[in-house]
Amino acid sequence: MITKLFTKIIGSRNDRTVKALKKIVKQINELEPQFASLADVDLQAKTVEFRQRLEKGEELDSLLPEAFATVREASKRVFAMRHFDVQMMGGIVLNNNQIAEMKTGEGKTLTATLPAYLNALTGQGVHIVTVNDYLARRDAEWSRPLFAFLGMTVGCNLSGMSHEEKQAAYACDITYGTNNEFGFDYLRDNMAFAAEQRVQRPLYYALVDEVDSVLIDEARTPLIISGAAEDSSELYIKINTLVPLLQKQDKEDSEEYQGNGHYTVDEKARQAYLTENGQIFVEGWLKQQGLMGEDDSLFSVANITLLHHVNAALRANTLFERDVDYIVKDDEVIIVDEHTGRTMAGRRWSEGLHQAIEAKEGAKIRNENQTLASITFQNYFRLYEKLAGMTGTADTEAYEFQQIYGLETVVLPTNRPMIRDDMGDLVYLTEQEKYDAIIEDIKIRVAEQRPVLVGTISIENSELLSNILTKEGIEHKVLNAKFHAQEAQIVAQAGRPSAVTIATNMAGRGTDIVLGGSWQAEIDALENPTAEQIATIKSEWQVRHDAVITSGGLHIIGTERHESRRIDNQLRGRSGRQGDPGSSRFYLSMEDSLMRIFASDRVSGMMKKLGMEHGEAIEHPWVSKAIENAQRKVEGRNFDIRKNLLEFDDVANDQRKVVYEQRNELLESADISETIKLIRTDVLDRVIDQYIAPHSLDESWDIAGLELRLRTDFAIDLPIAQWIKEDDKLYEEKIRERIISEIEASYAHKEELAGHDVLRQFEKSVMLQTLDNLWKEHLAAMDHLRQGIHLRGYAQKNPKQEYKREAFELFTQMLEALKQQVVSVLCRIQVQEPDVDAIEEQRRQSDSAQVRTYSHEEINALAEDEAESVDGQAVEPFVRDGAKIGRNDPCPCGSGKKYKHCHGKLD
């Protein structure tokens, strides 16, 4: 109460921020007459002027008023569109590394041009991030004329582009693209084998559209580049036949309750668990099928894989529904985004879940994958020097933006007052009663000539509602993942009088629903439209537009509350854009997912006290409050999950940064021979220490073991025992120096044979391949560690601290293995001696004075195989083409001279 009163007197933090923004906008507005008087050439010259001022040391932010005034004036001339003051405020917020909450229809696409232009002046590149390829392409094409007028280039980064197209897109001043594509390009760049293969420049400024969708909804989903692992499709099919034999046990309030079921389902945590009875039953079944030994336990280390398959099959059959969580198309299981209702082609669930669902649906089972590289959106976007975002609904997640990304949220006022009527929720006892009420509401709105947008939370629900409307004879359009291709066309005409559109969640987000329909879409559908046709279309649209405005605007119907209040607000936000009239209402039932899982007891109690009858709805602030509290609980739980994910991923992220930084240095270095020499000395020191301990008596030395190790790991046969026998004063340090000296000499000889440049390139190639192989294995080890780390809590240990400690140990081991394997491969390479016949042939064909043969492909193969070799095992050397010729042997040409005095001179 006191806080509210205090805020009312001095204003909230947001109010004070908006007040400060208005002062800067005033400065920009004062420049408008001056910039309006400039000729096109003079206005365009401003870009060059700004860049010169930056080069002379002027701060970027000091250019803001003039740069924004330039963009506003250019927009007036190119698009005949003038940035509103609230859009100017939005641009300032975005330049200040903050999140701008701008309501639907306030012109976020035009707003983005302001900070994009200003930050592109630095020449470091601006990335404008959208949620799908359609929006990226649309926004890039729309903004290109404006930026071209100002002398800037615009690129578009889409999936499926060639390497050259991507390089060209990233080389532009401003690049539009999707969050997925930017993230995957980053990972691919860090798997490149040459600096010129990379496409991205250093990450400077990212402006994220629909920032809540990208940084919050998708934060739990890591981007993963993977390769195929072992095939276990038959096992998935077999285990899937087990699940129908299992009986579900209903959870009871009493912890002592012991049911007879085989498994329980926790819908909140999206997990299924075997009961004690279930474990006994599953063990017996697996033994019957010959998948487990008679004396084996399901929980023994040897059977962890089987348990993993059983858990995946159980979750697939009890928690994941077709046309809700995924669709099956062309014998492929495609995930449906729970937040947008869009399909996510190419994405797969991990931990065998996707394969279990494929087995359940009888679809082709793809191999499990091994992670080659991964990163979460949380960590990818934190790599940018500057990060900002915009959305219509950020305030409910302001705390998370601040905590995770360090981004403040600024809620901007609308250009015109909001007049949408958000009516209270209506709650029914059953789903059938709810749908009956929705149909009646739709009939009323259609009769009033009002367009209706019905939001559902799944494809299944959208098709159920569509079937009911079809039976009732109500014409409508369905917009869900199955009709993704028609998305833009359906949304464009969703504002026509009496139009009824059913959409899953926020499908169609990013495209405004214009009251009366989109006249632009009608014109675009015509080939070479005449001026008369355009005038007719606009005239007819105006009549429809006025009719819809008069009847009350777009009516929004929510068929269920989403887990997040923000998603509900996004649905409501489709109506009432730019001061248009509109209304919204949510219809709920006690059988809805959210109500059943989180709010059922409290609301059910209220409804029973009120004596609800069939078909009767309850509309009361208490009910709305209870539902909102349920949503807050879910939001809090999801925030904890995301925060927990980040805390664990931060450990891997620190390691990722080190590896990628070292990898990039490798790519950009022409010569790493000094690094290799240091590594070689370090590795040899460690190896020698294992057999000749520092400051130890010679009786404890294992000379035979050292000779064997040097032979197998470094391909050098050194008679160390003979050295000691010949010189009894040869102490430890001298032995060490002599071993290293011999190996260095051997390596120098290889360099003579192979050539300096070739060996330098090969060293780099071996280092990169070995690093990539070990990093891949390290990621698998980290994933394995992560999956079981929570069990440390039972031993009264902090799982996060244990994870950090063990992850560091794994990382240290990986770095040591890297040194060991690189040195071993480089020491074991065999360079082919010259083939005399080939030399003679070459000499006859040309005047070339020198020929060397070097099998690069064979050496590459050795580098790849090294990761699989086991310590102590000898590796076959390269096979030489032809017999080796000693320098004192007779020359094969038949001259009778020694080889070294004849064709051997060519060496």
Swiss-Prot record:
Q: Main localization of the protein?
A: membrane
Reactions that this protein is recorded to catalyse: ATP + H2O + cellular proteinSide 1 = ADP + phosphate + cellular proteinSide 2
Cell membrane as UniProt keyword: yes
InterPro entries, per this entry?
A: Helicase_ATP-bd, P-loop_NTPase, SEC_C_motif, SecA, SecA_CS, SecA_DEAD, SecA_motor_DEAD, SecA_preprotein_X-link_dom
Tell me which GO cellular component terms the UniProt record holds: cell envelope Sec protein transport complex; cytosol; plasma membrane
Protease in keyword set:
no
Q: Which SUPFAM superfamilies match?
A: Helical scaffold and wing domains of SecA, P-loop containing nucleoside triphosphate hydrolases, Pre-protein crosslinking domain of SecA
Subcellular compartments? Cell inner membrane; Cytoplasm
Per its UniProt record, the required cofactor names are: Zn(2+)
Q: How does it sit in the membrane?
A: Peripheral membrane protein
**Annotated residues for binding of ATP:** Q87, G105, E106, G107, K108, T109, D512
What note does UniProt attach to the cofactor annotation? May bind 1 zinc ion per subunit.
Q: What positions does the entry give for Zn(2+) binding?
A: C891, C893, C902, H903
Q: Which GO terms describe its biological process?
A: intracellular protein transmembrane transport; protein import; protein targeting; protein transport by the Sec complex
Identify a single GO molecular function assigned to this protein.
Answer: metal ion binding
Q: Which UniProt keywords apply?
A: ATP-binding, Cell inner membrane, Cell membrane, Cytoplasm, Membrane, Metal-binding, Nucleotide-binding, Protein transport, Translocase, Translocation, Transport, Zinc
Entry-linked PANTHER family: CHLOROPLAST PROTEIN-TRANSPORTING ATPASE, SECA INNER MEMBRANE COMPONENT OF SEC PROTEIN SECRETION SYSTEM
Entry-linked NCBIfam families: PRK12904.1 (NF009538), secA (TIGR00963)
Q: State the name under which the record lists this protein.
A: Protein translocase subunit SecA
